[in-house]
């Protein structure tokens, strides 16, 4: 499959493809953007990087679960978790217990952290998850090979 293809020379329409996942039956699933000009290497990189960033953001926001409950990691929630953790550490747990809402609006799960060890377990797993998602995204962006886009 061509990653860069002119699909209409008269209208100067080009398609850029990335994240190609080939299946056993020979077909493939991929992302694609159609442009009204032949993109430069930097445009291709920017397009693909932006998509990888969006995928990482979505995974961070809604891909983490703790004790089998989904945890919504919005920027605000990340800040609240960090603030609660930092305060608990600084006061040697005197600010505990602290309760967070996990799950969904339809099926909320309220989790109360009674001990510093308990809260530390949650917070370190949250941070590790975010770091793992970011690291995977960086690897994908670093692996963009513009030589595969030569038309």
Named regions from a protein language model:
Residues 2-151:
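A preference for well-ordered globular domain cores
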């Amino acid at each position: 499959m061509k990653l860069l293809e002119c699909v209409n020379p008269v209208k100067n329409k080009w398609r850029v493809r990335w994240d190609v996942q080939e299946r056993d039956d020979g077909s493939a699933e991929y992302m694609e953007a159609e442009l009204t000009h032949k993109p430069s290497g930097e445009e291709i990189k920017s397009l693909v990087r932006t998509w990888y960033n969006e995928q990482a953001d979505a995974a961070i926001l809604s891909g983490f679960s703790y004790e089998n409950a989904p945890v919504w990691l919005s920027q605000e929630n990340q800040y609240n978790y960090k603030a609660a953790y930092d305060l608990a550490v600084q006061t040697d747990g005197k600010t505990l217990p602290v309760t967070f809402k996990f799950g969904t609006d339809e099926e909320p799960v309220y989790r109360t952290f009674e001990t510093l060890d308990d809260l530390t377990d949650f917070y370190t797993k949250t941070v590790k998850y975010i770091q793992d998602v970011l690291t995977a995204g960086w690897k994908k962006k670093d692996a963009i090979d513009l030589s595969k886009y030569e038309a």
